[in-house]
């Protein structure tokens, strides 16, 4: 009898230790409803001195005709070069574009992340491209698609 009472007490205490934690509160998904946005035909061409880089692409939200965009990033100093500079804001139709370069993965592994905001829909995507994808001004293939997030 003593064994079974001790065993039962152990089992009951163990169940409280392993009980699921209480939820911390509800979270709201910030992902927008609707289709992914596709960045079409993107290329970045920099001048020989790397003081100006011109990005050309189309933003296709899947809800209307694609919006053509020419986005220019300039470097006023010798460093960082335009290909490694932050840029914007710049307007392309209903969209506002900004960008930031990162070298966090080491030399030769840099990448640029664009912020593409639909001002009317209050939605955003963050297309990102490696320096290798953008090298030589070639068009990135295949096109890349991103799920938009809703801005608060």
Question: Model segments located where?
Answer:
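Acidic, low-complexity intrinsically disordered segments
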Residues: 80-152
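Short, surface-exposed binding/anchoring microloops in extracellular/periplasmic proteins
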Residues: 25-78
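Short, flexible beta-strand-to-coil junctions
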Residues: 17, 60-62, 117-122
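A broad, structure-centric signal for solvent-exposed, well-ordered loop/edge residues
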Residues: 8, 46-49, 104, 123
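Fungal secretory targeting signals
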Residues: 1-26
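A generic structural signal for short, solvent-exposed coil/turn residues
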Residues: 4, 11, 31, 49, ...
């Amino acid at each position: 009898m003593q064994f079974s009472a001790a065993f039962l007490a152990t089992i009951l205490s163990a169940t409280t230790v392993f009980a699921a934690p209480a939820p911390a509160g509800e979270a709201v998904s910030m992902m927008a409803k609707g289709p992914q946005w596709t960045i079409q035909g993107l290329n970045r061409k920099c001048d020989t001195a790397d003081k100006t880089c011109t990005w050309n692409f189309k933003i296709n939200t899947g809800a209307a005709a694609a919006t053509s965009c020419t986005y220019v990033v300039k470097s006023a100093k010798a460093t960082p070069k335009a290909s490694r500079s932050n840029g914007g804001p710049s307007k392309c139709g209903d969209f506002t574009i900004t960008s930031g370069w990162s070298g966090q993965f080491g030399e030769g592994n840099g990448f640029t992340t664009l912020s593409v905001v639909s001002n009317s829909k209050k939605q955003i995507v963050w297309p990102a491209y490696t320096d290798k994808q953008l090298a030589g001004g070639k068009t990135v293939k295949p096109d890349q698609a991103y799920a938009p997030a809703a801005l608060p």
